[in-house]
């Protein structure tokens, strides 16, 4: 059990979050987590339906899959994010009129997230089950409320170390705070 607990509030539609994973993911794992000094908890701070879709997919397969799923979604953010405008333009009001679960499934398929997550070994049926899971949706909604309303984070990524907010949102900021 690590003595230092880091909580990261993240959004999959946040380019700064993707940059943090790219810049700080490996050193955080190698220098702190692998040595048993730090544990990391990812908490979603969802901003919209696209973000909710990615958040639900990131948690598909349970706790053991969250980090790998999240890393893949951030690594491919430009790939699926680049399809959003054309997908939304093509779907228009039709998408807005769909029930929430159908929206989530349509977004996942239309942006290519379903195909991306297949790289992690998930079938479309498994991914759809994750997207429409009411307990998973509620869990992410609760994390989001805690992030924005209770903690009043300023943006994503945001970090806590043992419950105390870290000033700054970049890897050097977190690294310095961990060394302090």
Q: At which residue positions do the language-model features occur?
A:
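Residue-level signal for beta-strand positions within conserved beta-sheet cores that form or flank
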Residues: 2, 36, 155
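C-terminal cap of thioredoxin/glutaredoxin-like
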Residues: 11, 104-180
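Conserved strand-loop elements at the edges of beta-sheets that form or border functional pockets
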Residues: 8, 22, 168
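Sec/Tat-exported extracytoplasmic proteins
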Residues: 13, 32, 36, 61-65, ...
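Short active-site neighborhood of thiol/selenol oxidoreductases, capturing the structured segment around
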Residues: 2-18, 40-41
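Structural alpha/beta surface segment adjacent to cysteine/selenocysteine redox centers
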Residues: 18-105
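A short alpha-helix capping/helix-coil boundary motif
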Residues: 6-9, 91-94, 123-124
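A short, structure-level motif marking secondary-structure boundaries and short turns
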Residues: 12-15, 97-99, 128-129
């Amino acid at each position: 059990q690590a003595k230092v607990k880091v909580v990261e509030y993240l959004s999959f539609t946040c380019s700064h979050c993707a940059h943090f994973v790219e810049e700080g993911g490996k050193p955080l794992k190698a220098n702190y987590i692998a040595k048993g000094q730090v544990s990391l908890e990812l908490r979603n701070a969802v901003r919209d339906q696209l973000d909710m879709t990615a958040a639900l997919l990131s948690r598909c397969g349970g706790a053991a899959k969250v980090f790998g799923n999240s890393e893949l979604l951030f690594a491919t953010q430009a790939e699926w994010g680049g399809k959003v405008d054309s997908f939304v333009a093509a779907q228009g009001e039709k998408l807005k009129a769909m029930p929430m679960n159908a929206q989530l499934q349509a977004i996942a398929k239309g942006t290519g997230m379903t195909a991306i997550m297949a790289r992690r070994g998930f079938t479309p049926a498994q991914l759809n089950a994750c997207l429409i899971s009411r307990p998973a949706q509620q869990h992410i909604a609760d994390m989001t409320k805690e992030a924005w309303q209770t903690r009043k984070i300023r943006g994503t990524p945001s970090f806590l170390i043992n419950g105390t907010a870290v000033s700054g949102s970049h890897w050097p900021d977190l690294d310095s705070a961990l060394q302090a």
